[in-house]
C-alpha cells in the first residue's frame, strides 16, 4: 500500500491581543507529524511582531459570535502577504512572509530526504 504524502502547509496568521487593539503575527504549520504522536500536530511559531492597521476583507467572514458581531479575515495581496495601512506594519507582514517561505522550504526538503 502506498503511503500518503504529508503536505505540510505553512501560513501567516493573526491573533488578536487581549488588552490592546493590535494583532500578533505568527506562522502556523499543519499537518506536522512528530515522533511519538499518532495524530498530526499544529505548530505555531510566534514572531514577536504586532500590527495595528490590517485591512479587513469584508467579503470573507471569519466567524460570527452569539450577539451577531461578524469578524473578517485580513485582506491579502497576490503573493498572500497580509495588507496593512501603515508602512511599518506592512514591513512586519513582509518579514512574516519571508519566515513562512523559509519554513515551507524546510518542510519540503525534509519530505524529499
Language-model regions, residue ranges each:
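Basic/aromatic DNA-contact patch characteristic of tyrosine site-specific recombinases
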Residues: 1-112
